[in-house]
Amino acid sequence: MKILIAEYAGFCFGVKRAIETAYQEIEKGDGKKIYTLGEIIHNPQVISDLSKKGVNVIEEEELDKLTEGDKLIIRSHGVSKKLYDFLAKKGVEVIDVTCPFVKKVQNIVYEYYHKGYSIIIVGDRNHPEVIGVNGWCDDTAYVVNSIEEAYELPQLEKACAVAQTTLIEKHWKDILEVIKLKVKDLIFFNTICDATQKRQDAADELSKKVDVMFVIGGKHSSNTQKLKKICEKNCKNTFHIEDAEELTLEMVKDHEIIGVTAGASTPDYVIEDVIKKIRFLKGEDGDE
């Protein structure tokens, strides 16, 4: 048996920084209440551990509950400009760990919106990152996530197009070709995070070489779902699991070359636990 791990898998820089910041705030022990706006990452194990240590998840509609001096961690997905203004008025201490790649998208959108450009975001309109980015152009962006939706765009005089940072490269390029037909004066920025691209490319390459592929990450994690889609094109035996507990003998018993990758919200220890469980189920030490 061989266990092969994708060259790029697990925590990305932005997520790692967000988690480290949350634990640093806990260690300060200054008695202030600590909240995260939404789950800091799509990983139930990490969320559970933070909750036990006093970091509570709060949703946008609950922000009125915050009082002066409370700490609010803005997660790597980022938020709208209006939200920053609202929190400043309330006297809430904002700990901003918006991913630098997402911050770049926000800045582009803000700049070109104020130059008079229509804004087009290619991505999932319900994803927190896209919702936040749209908030930097007063929620006026056209959000498209398919070729069909791109064809439904009106003819625009001038527009600026950006991508959700976790988008699949081909998806962005295909939709962009349609957008070009719809805009007379188009400026576009490929704002897909290079860590996302490296993770996707590595998963694509590995899934061509294995008998079974495990994609580890939260079931609600956008980037993990995309990894699964990429892998299952090459390997029909592709499983999306959150942790080692979901692994069964049935998944591995007939396979000798086993591939493992993980989403940006998956800690190293979860990946290690999955590998240990695979070895246990196969009754072998294996090699990596």
Swiss-Prot record:
Keywords on record: 4Fe-4S, Iron, Iron-sulfur, Isoprene biosynthesis, Metal-binding, Oxidoreductase
Pathway: Isoprenoid biosynthesis; dimethylallyl diphosphate biosynthesis; dimethylallyl diphosphate from (2E)-4-hydroxy-3-methylbutenyl diphosphate: step 1/1; Isoprenoid biosynthesis; isopentenyl diphosphate biosynthesis via DXP pathway; isopentenyl diphosphate from 1-deoxy-D-xylulose 5-phosphate: step 6/6
InterPro entries from the UniProt entry: LytB/IspH
Active site, renumbered: 129 (proton donor)
Catalytic activity as recorded in UniProt: isopentenyl diphosphate + 2 oxidized [2Fe-2S]-[ferredoxin] + H2O = (2E)-4-hydroxy-3-methylbut-2-enyl diphosphate + 2 reduced [2Fe-2S]-[ferredoxin] + 2 H(+); dimethylallyl diphosphate + 2 oxidized [2Fe-2S]-[ferredoxin] + H2O = (2E)-4-hydroxy-3-methylbut-2-enyl diphosphate + 2 reduced [2Fe-2S]-[ferredoxin] + 2 H(+)
Enzyme Commission number(s): 1.17.7.4
Annotated positions binding isopentenyl diphosphate: 42, 77, 127, 221-223, 265
Domain of life, source organism: Bacteria
Biological process annotations from GO: dimethylallyl diphosphate biosynthetic process; isopentenyl diphosphate biosynthetic process, methylerythritol 4-phosphate pathway; terpenoid biosynthetic process
Note on how the cofactor is bound: Binds 1 [4Fe-4S] cluster per subunit.
Cysteines paired by S-S bonds: none
Pfam families, per the entry: LYTB
Binding of (2E)-4-hydroxy-3-methylbut-2-enyl diphosphate, residues: 42, 77, 127, 165, 221-223, 265
Obligatory cofactor(s): [4Fe-4S] cluster
PANTHER family reported in the protein's UniProt record: 4-HYDROXY-3-METHYLBUT-2-ENYL DIPHOSPHATE REDUCTASE (PTHR30426:SF0)
HAMAP family: IspH
Cross-referenced NCBIfam families: ispH_lytB, PRK01045.1-1, PRK12360.1
Function: Catalyzes the conversion of 1-hydroxy-2-methyl-2-(E)-butenyl 4-diphosphate (HMBPP) into a mixture of isopentenyl diphosphate (IPP) and dimethylallyl diphosphate (DMAPP). Acts in the terminal step of the DOXP/MEP pathway for isoprenoid precursor biosynthesis.
Protein name: 4-hydroxy-3-methylbut-2-enyl diphosphate reductase
Organism: Thermoanaerobacter pseudethanolicus (strain ATCC 33223 / 39E) (Clostridium thermohydrosulfuricum)
